[in-house]
Swiss-Prot record:
Belongs to the methyltransferase superfamily. Type-7 methyltransferase family. SABATH subfamily. It holds the Pfam family Methyltransf_7. S-adenosyl-L-homocysteine binds at Y18, C59, N64, D106, L107, S145, Y146. Keywords: Magnesium, Metal-binding, Methyltransferase, Plant defense, S-adenosyl-L-methionine, Transferase. It is an enzyme of class 2 (transferase). It comes from the Eukaryota. This is Benzoate O-methyltransferase.
Length: 385
């Protein structure tokens, strides 16, 4: 599995596309908007850059990037207003006006065509609206893994990444498809039957990747620059108890059913491990501290959202099951299919896609009928001193 080559969200605008099934991420972007706005205002007020470089890492091709761009622009306009200074050109004071360069980054397989069509449509829509002036801004794409260097040293003022850093740069070292015998039989992530030694391989891959990510971004950030990072995690320290564990265990069970039906070779399943890991807040804080880098943590928090991206109910302690598990299971299946499609097709072939996620939907309905499960999200803001 070559993650840089193979991994991307489902393209286009159809029923199964990521752009049509990313509402959960959209809700989270709104949930963390105050965090982004605060970071933008702090960077602007402290540095007063003439050109402010803002990078969205793992932008995908859904509407969430447009929400992020809008949030940054409105925050700059508000910060400029607080300083009694218009954010865009005019008059003799142009040397003090900021221009923004947005850099939208994702892997080369991302649907950048759809992304930039959406950006252009937003440009046109915004041009026809009366709103407070915002600074001039420019948008470019950068197809590359964020586990590589992306920018010159000390050139970026703000990094943003939403629902990406749970993904690893590769399958855990030691679990590659070519290795025999299979060490994580019938599983594709950390499950109840995963041995502690295999769970440790997933943890170590996260530690390696996240430490590298911090190092690279530290080199690229200006002093006083910030990173707002939002990603899936787990709510306690038990590596076997995360919400992702339950979710991907159901995907594995769906694939196992295809093996029993003769649609998938058992060896194929045994050689498939997802490049993913949901850390705890404690693990994240420890890696930031261990890095020895000049990062201060402005904020770190976690919050939960229902598996069903269209279920916004708070779900108090008395509500333990989903009221309409059949409907919710369809929404969950569409979301996970839009995320995993490229990896499943690359490894098992497109012919199994419908059968796999039909069975997954059935399993999710059964699960949600017994237990209302939530995603745990970690949100953090780091400042480079």
């Amino acid at each position: 599995m070559d993650i840089r080559r193979d991994f991307h969200m489902a393209e286009g605008e159809g029923e199964w596309s990521y752009s049509k099934n990313c509402r959960r991420q959209q809700v989270a972007v709104r949930e963390t908007r105050p965090m982004v706005e605060t970071a933008v205002k702090q960077v602007y007020a402290a540095l007063l850059p003439r050109t402010m470089v803002v990078a969205d890492l793992g932008c995908s091709a859904g509407p969430n990037t447009l929400l992020f761009i809008s949030s940054v622009l409105s925050s700059i306009a508000a910060a400029a207003a607080e300083q009694c200074k218009p954010p865009s050109g005019g008059g003799d004071d142009d040397d003090h006006h900021v221009e923004l360069q947005f850099v939208l980054n994702d892997l080369p397989g991302n649907d950048f065509n759809h992304l930039f069509r959406s950006v252009e449509e937003e440009f046109r829509r915004a041009a026809g609206c009366e709103r407070a002036p915002h600074p001039p801004y420019y948008v470019m794409g950068l197809p590359e893994s964020y586990y590589n260097r992306l920018f010159p040293r000390q050139s970026v003022h703000l990094f943003h990444s939403s629902y990406c850093l749970q993904w690893r740069s590769q399958e855990p070292e030691g679990l590659e498809a070519w290795r025999k015998p299979c060490l994580n039989e019938d599983n594709i992530y950390i499950a109840r039957t995963t041995t502690p030694s295999v769970a440790k391989l997933f943890q170590e891959q996260f530690q390696k990747d996240f430490s590298l990510f911090l190092k690279l971004r530290h080199e690229e950030l200006v002093h006083g620059g910030r990173m707002v990072l939002i990603f899936l995690g787990r709510k306690n320290e038990d590596v076997y108890s995360g919400d992702l564990n339950q979710l991907f265990a159901l995907v594995a069970t769906a694939l196992q059913s295809l093996v029993l039906k003769g649609l998938v070779e058992k060896e194929k399943l045994e050689s498939f491990n997802l490049p993913v890991y949901g850390p705890s807040v404690g693990e994240v804080e420890e890696l930031v501290t261990r890095s020895g880098l000049q990062f201060s943590m402005d904020l770190i928090k976690q919050f939960e959202m229902n598996w069903d991206p269209f279920d916004d109910s708070e779900g108090d302690n008395d509500v333990v099951v989903v009221e309409d598990s059949a409907r919710s299971s369809v929404n969950v299946a569409k979301l996970i299919r839009s995320v995993l499609k490229a990896l499943v097709v690359r490894h098992f072939g497109e012919a199994v896609l419908d059968a796999c996620f039909a069975e997954f939907r059935r399993l999710v309905a059964e699960h949600l009928g017994k237990e209302k499960t939530k995603f745990t999200t970690i949100a953090m803001c780091l400042k480079k001193e």
